[in-house]
């Protein structure tokens, strides 16, 4: 069944919707949910950005973070040292493999 409008014909039957009628119902519910969420205010103090509601990951990189205080240079030196040790282990493994095969 179709109804005609000034711009052309549009099908009204639910069976013609892509994915069937259940998909159309899900899409409609999702649109209603999105409009309801966008119209409502923050759900709680955490969503409103109240003090003390910062995620833990962001606290790791601030001066107020609890725990170890490590200088960025120390982190870089340890990182490069770890990468170098892995590189050297690969080289040693190749050398040992070469001598073991002879």
Curated annotation (Swiss-Prot):
Name of the molecule in the record: Protein transport protein sec61 subunit beta
One Gene Ontology CC term in the entry: membrane
Function: Necessary for protein translocation in the endoplasmic reticulum.
Coiled-coil annotated spans: none
Biological process terms in GO annotation: post-translational protein targeting to membrane, translocation; protein insertion into ER membrane; SRP-dependent cotranslational protein targeting to membrane, translocation
Top-level lineage group: Eukaryota
Provenance organism: Schizosaccharomyces pombe (strain 972 / ATCC 24843) (Fission yeast)
Molecular functions (GO terms): guanyl-nucleotide exchange factor activity
UniProt KW keywords: Endoplasmic reticulum, Membrane, Protein transport, Translocation, Transmembrane, Transmembrane helix, Transport
Stated family: Belongs to the SEC61-beta family.
Chain positions covered by the region annotation Disordered: 1-53
Topology in the lipid bilayer: Single-pass membrane protein
Keyword Transmembrane in record: yes
Subcellular location: Endoplasmic reticulum membrane
Biased composition (Polar residues): 1-15
Keyword Endoplasmic reticulum: yes
Positions in the Cytoplasmic compartment: 1-72
InterPro entries xref list: Sec61-beta/Sbh (IPR030671), SecG/Sec61-beta/Sbh (IPR016482)
Subunit text: Heterotrimeric complex composed of SEC61, SBH1 and SSS1.
Biased composition (Low complexity): 41-52
Membrane spanning stretches: 73-93
């Amino acid at each position: 069944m179709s109804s005609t409008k000034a711009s052309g014909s549009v099908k009204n039957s639910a069976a013609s919707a892509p994915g069937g009628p259940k998909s159309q119902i899900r899409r409609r519910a999702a649109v209603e949910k999105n409009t309801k969420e966008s119209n409502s205010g923050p759900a709680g103090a955490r969503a409103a950005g109240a003090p003390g509601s910062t995620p833990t990951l962001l606290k790791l990189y601030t001066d107020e973070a609890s725990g170890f205080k490590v200088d960025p240079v120390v982190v870089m030196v340890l990182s490069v040292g770890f990468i170098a040790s892995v590189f050297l282990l690969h080289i040693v493994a190749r050398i040992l493999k070469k001598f073991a095969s002879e």
